Amino acid sequence: MIDFNKLLSAEVDKSYYPFFSLDNCLLDNPSCVGLAKDFPDIKSGGSIPPSSINLEESIKKLISDLESKEMKDILEEKLNVDLSNSEIVTTLRGYSRKKDGKIHTDSKSKIITLLLYLNESWDYETGKLRMLKNEENLDDFIKEIPATLGSVVAFKVTENCFHGFLPFEGKRQSIQMNYVYKKNVKTHKLRHFLSSLFK
């Protein structure tokens, strides 16, 4: 599902904090075209663990690619991190609320965050993730990430890895994968599981 050669060729932006992105990281084959339609119909906000929802085989395969050693090796090399003392926490999002997208950095328990968008198209000016230069201004961004099918961004979690998006309400499909320090994994998984019970 994932074209690892494309990922290897992506240029890392280190101007503020290390990240790289691609407009489409998927292989050029028919099974990838239907991923947006195969994505589970999530009608509430927040993050859903894959284990708590029924998934099509194509989405399972995609997650398997994301969590593969090949992907791990690429992330370690490109973002210059050591992931030997980490575990993966993967979640799905299918619906954006107006309150989502506020400027933030990710928690220090995370080493890397990867976001893969799975929307057939995106005809809105809002809802597109912005990699920001500071915590004050959503319009002062390094790069704006498309929310279309196959669009991906991965960044090293730092004290200044500010990101966010202009408020959007509606379907906004993505998979988020984090490499989390092992000592924090149980806390992350429990929080996502408890959250999913109330969706």
Could you say what each language-model-derived stretch is?
Residues 1-154, 158-199:
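Fe(II)/2-oxoglutarate oxygenase catalytic core
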